[in-house]
Amino acid sequence: KPHRRRIQCVFRDFQDGKTLTADLLMKQPEMDSICIATPWKENQKAFYYNQKVNCMPVKGKVNFDGRDYIFDGRKDMAVLDWGRGVWTYDNIWRWGTCSTRLNGVPFGFNLGYGFSDRSSATENVIFYDGRAHKLQEVVFMIGQDDKGNFNYMDPWTISSSDGRFEGIFEPILDRKAKIDMKVIASDQHQVFGHLTGTAVLDDGTELKMRDVI
């Protein structure tokens, strides 16, 4: 159907020989989204074209180990991350997203940097009640040990250069994966957690975030 996306999955041997299944239907809401096309300084033929759609109502079911996890389209949300491009060989990318409700109003954000040259455009944005509120540069401050390794499970500080997005991120899970095929490698840390802080809309309205996921 138009403006809908369906995800169906059968993942055999997901964990301990057990199968995970999923059937989820996401609806694209009538609201703003963020879309950027950015180059790389070191290679003008490389580019990244990307769209993020937040606050998508999602309904359906995920089953694992005999237990059903039900998603209710009246309260549960998803995000669509869609990208295409010709990328350079070596990259670091920081990305954060959220879709929830604040005081009953759809709220979300998309934050990212490090992947392509963002000097001309960023993907940093707040979504509130269907409208996008653009942010300037954002940085994730993650603690490190004495060897320079990131402590991903320690609290992070997230801050925007315009002062309109400030928060403390408390991790609860680090889904990490390191794949090395010699000619290509990937070192991923997909960290889930709670964020507490403030987000300021274009008209100066300050929104309080408390333990949003």
Q: What are these model-predicted stretches?
A:
Residues K1-I213:
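Structured soluble/peripheral alpha/beta segments that form catalytic or ligand/cofactor-binding pockets
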